[in-house]
């Protein structure tokens, strides 16, 4: 790797706010990145930077950086909760869905107009999930609500810790103490996947065949959904609180260590050992986000660094240096050319990372990004 500068300094738009970033999500069309803040505000960052930095092809090959000709647009702020934003998701019909500790589920349009979707008295709405096919759901404690033409409510065995729709949007996975509950959209019937322990987050493989949770017991647990066969993945020094599958489903990247930990999933095998990726920072990994197309992982650290790496490789591209709090949220844009990130100290950024920045060989997962 030959990267003379930190990429955020060359290709990034940065802002600072007076509250921690809880979550970040892009709207369905990638026009805007919404940052849910700890003070109940949504900060909207325009993802279309007119006169922003760009890459210019060189006559002799490679690319060169062209500096921005205009500053990025300022953030737009919308107060959506009386307390804290707790959950955020892109709404399939446009805009964003936000849940908060005031018991409100709010739909926010990109023009700043908001609509109250649901209100739970004396309860927190701390989990929100949506699918491109139109599914919308939220949870408050043990109650999970399915929104739509035929709304329904499901009482699960423990408080919901995470929710995710499968790739087809037909099943909702809800993690909790003791395992995962699957809720089918067509029949509204539930199915239990049981494993002892506290399951804090959940992720589907892109083909919907596997489901994985990160556990408080410093381990992962997975299931082959068809027959509920168990997949055990242990040995973490810390809790794997962030999970992300590669676009082709060949590997799962997680936090929980000093480097990103990647497990093979093509398919998973009982004797497989994970591959650590990137380099060890001075602090543990806090967030991971796989690139939507390429075999790359964006890795955020508690110390504030953000790097790009490939599974099993120690080569990295440095996106952001240390400082400004732990990386608390990351999300790739729908057009896969921008990475939005936020920290616990209120540092927000959108970094332009187009395909021209990377160089891959013909074989799968070969070659590494060329810093120019």
State what each model feature region is.
Residues 1-372:
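WD40-repeat beta-propeller superdomains and closely related acidic/aromatic-rich repeat-like regions
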């Amino acid at each position: 790797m030959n990267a003379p500068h930190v990429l955020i300094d060359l290709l990034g738009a940065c802002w600072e706010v007076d509250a921690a970033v809880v979550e970040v999500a892009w709207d369905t069309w990638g026009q805007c990145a919404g940052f849910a803040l700890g003070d109940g505000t949504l900060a909207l960052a325009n993802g279309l930077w007119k006169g922003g930095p760009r890459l210019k092809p060189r006559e002799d090959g490679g690319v060169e950086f062209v500096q921005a000709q205009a500053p990025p647009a300022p953030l737009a702020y919308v107060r959506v909760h009386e307390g804290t934003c707790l959950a955020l998701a892109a709404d399939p019909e446009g805009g964003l869905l936000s849940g908060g500790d005031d018991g409100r589920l709010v739909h926010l349009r990109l023009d700043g107009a908001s609509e109250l979707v649901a209100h739970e008295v004396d309860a927190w709405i701390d989990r929100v999930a949506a699918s491109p096919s139109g599914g919308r759901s939220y949870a408050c404690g043990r109650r999970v609500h399915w929104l739509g033409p035929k709304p329904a409510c499901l009482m699960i065995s423990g408080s919901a810790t995470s929710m995710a729709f499968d790739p087809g949007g037909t099943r909702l996975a809800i993690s909790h103490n003791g395992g995962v509950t699957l809720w089918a959209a067509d029949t509204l019937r539930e199915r239990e996947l049981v494993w002892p322990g506290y399951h804090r987050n959940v992720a589907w493989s892109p083909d919907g065949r596997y489901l994985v949770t990160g556990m408080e017991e410093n381990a992962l647990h997975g299931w082959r959904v068809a027959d509920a066969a168990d997949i055990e993945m242990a040995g973490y020094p810390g809790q794997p609180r962030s999970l992300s599958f590669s676009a082709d489903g060949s590997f799962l990247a997680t936090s929980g260590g000093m480097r990103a930990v990647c497990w093979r999933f093509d398919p998973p095998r009982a004797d497989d050992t994970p591959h650590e990726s990137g380099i060890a920072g001075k602090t543990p990994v806090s967030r991971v986000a796989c690139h939507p197309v390429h075999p790359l992982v964006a890795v955020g650290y508690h110390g504030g660094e953000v790097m790009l790496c490939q599974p099993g490789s120690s080569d990295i591209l440095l996106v952001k240096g240390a400082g400004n709090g732990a990386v608390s949220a990351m999300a790739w844009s729908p057009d896969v050319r921008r990475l939005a990130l936020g920290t616990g100290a209120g540092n927000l950024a959108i970094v332009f990372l187009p395909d021209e920045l990377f160089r891959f060989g013909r074989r799968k997962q070969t070659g590494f990004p060329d810093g120019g």
